[in-house]
Amino acid sequence: MSSVPANAPLRPIGILGGTFDPIHYGHLRLAEEAREALALERVLFIPAGDPPHRPAPGTPAAHRLGMVRCALRGHAAFRADDLELRRSGKSYTVITLETLRRRYGPRRSLVLILGADAFFGLPSWHQWQRLFELAHVLVAMRPDFPPPWGSEPPEDDPPEPGAGLPPALQDVLAERRAPKLARFAETPAGLVGFFRNTPLAISATTIRRLLYEGRSARYLLPEAVLRYITTHSLYQGDPGNP
């Protein structure tokens, strides 16, 4: 029998999706800073199968998952999860969150980690308002990203909604904005919070272009991922649309 009380607090689970084509230090640093900010028990890295808002990744799913596994090796709090790759059809986030909610149960706090640009486009997502029934949303605000509320908020205060946001998101923030990130651990879903992450000017597009041109991509992504890329001859030949 478990010695953990039935009402013991459960630490939140972070969820970071992406094509990871390839995974790089920008992804890893974002996950680490989110883990630290919210005391996450773990962060799930979920490679997209068929993303609905962008062209399908050029690299096969098995290799993108393999690169993620290489990058996360030795990180006890980071896990690769292939649930979207095992599912047919578009990789809608709402379906992913439904699956994770069934897995972790109704009490566990789930936290969807998004960049600011993805958050601002949230109203275009499939069944986007249902996301808040299934998880919290943590928005990473890069210092170089222009805030839509007109001025930089204090370091310990989340931003106020403003005219730069779509009206639907203004309504969401008015109802769901978390006064403190610690609130995420107190409920399983429904809140929106913001935090500033370290800006790393690294993109998968840049890495692919460097590799297609035969140039070095060292120090932009883990050495284990570079070895995987070399072993499997990825990002070689005609890049087409890198």
Feature map (PLM): residue ranges:
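Nucleotidyltransferase catalytic core that binds NTPs
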Residues: 1-242
